[in-house]
Amino acid sequence: MVEDILAPGLRVVFCGINPGLSSAGTGFPFAHPANRFWKVIYQAGFTDRQLKPQEAQHLLDYRCGVTKLVDRPTVQANEVSKQELHAGGRKLIEKIEDYQPQALAILGKQAYEQGFSQRGAQWGKQTLTIGSTQIWVLPNPSGLSRVSLEKLVEAYRELDQALVVRGL
């Protein structure tokens, strides 16, 4: 089981779709060697060094957290049903209301659209909020994603810079 890494007062909570088998096996988020999450958040400015999956708890030192829409691990995220994503979206809203981070970053358009019953999402900041928490949709850093490392870093950096501008 991959546990959430959450605390009150975070700058951002990154929300993956669901754990892959590598993460489920190790208990650490974004654990597959091909997953670019740790490299991306470092290069985008969220951390001052590239953390390893087993150092995930140190995200809290940077006022960052991690959660997921669906707890069930799969080989590929497309094995998760629309119903699971929708139910996960409802649970996620409750978590965000409890912890009130400044931003929630959903990692993937389809995850956001199905989890929050939205259509036509664009990358970046959304108009929908959860209380005062901004919602951002960022490309998924999975090794299966065709988005280049450069584009991932650019998208994540935009969120980091928006938080910096707000003094966070």
Swiss-Prot record:
<comment type="function">
    <text>Excises ethenocytosine and uracil, which can arise by alkylation or deamination of cytosine, respectively, from the corresponding mispairs with guanine in ds-DNA. It is capable of hydrolyzing the carbon-nitrogen bond between the sugar-phosphate backbone of the DNA and the mispaired base. The complementary strand guanine functions in substrate recognition. Required for DNA damage lesion repair in stationary-phase cells.</text>
</comment>
<keyword id="KW-0378">Hydrolase</keyword>
<comment type="subunit">
    <text>Binds DNA as a monomer.</text>
</comment>
<dbReference type="GO" id="GO:0006285">
    <property type="term" value="P:base-excision repair, AP site formation"/>
</dbReference>
<dbReference type="GO" id="GO:0005737">
    <property type="term" value="C:cytoplasm"/>
</dbReference>
<dbReference type="GO" id="GO:0003677">
    <property type="term" value="F:DNA binding"/>
</dbReference>
<keyword id="KW-0238">DNA-binding</keyword>
<dbReference type="GO" id="GO:0008263">
    <property type="term" value="F:pyrimidine-specific mismatch base pair DNA N-glycosylase activity"/>
</dbReference>
<keyword id="KW-0228">DNA excision</keyword>
<dbReference type="GO" id="GO:0004844">
    <property type="term" value="F:uracil DNA N-glycosylase activity"/>
</dbReference>
<dbReference type="InterPro" id="IPR015637">
    <property type="entry name" value="MUG/TDG"/>
</dbReference>
<dbReference type="InterPro" id="IPR023502">
    <property type="entry name" value="MUG_bact"/>
</dbReference>
<dbReference type="InterPro" id="IPR005122">
    <property type="entry name" value="Uracil-DNA_glycosylase-like"/>
</dbReference>
<keyword id="KW-0234">DNA repair</keyword>
<dbReference type="InterPro" id="IPR036895">
    <property type="entry name" value="Uracil-DNA_glycosylase-like_sf"/>
</dbReference>
<keyword id="KW-0227">DNA damage</keyword>
<keyword id="KW-0963">Cytoplasm</keyword>
<protein>
    <recommendedName>
        <fullName>G/U mismatch-specific DNA glycosylase</fullName>
        <ecNumber>3.2.2.28</ecNumber>
    </recommendedName>
</protein>
<dbReference type="Pfam" id="PF03167">
    <property type="entry name" value="UDG"/>
</dbReference>
<comment type="similarity">
    <text>Belongs to the uracil-DNA glycosylase (UDG) superfamily. TDG/mug family.</text>
</comment>
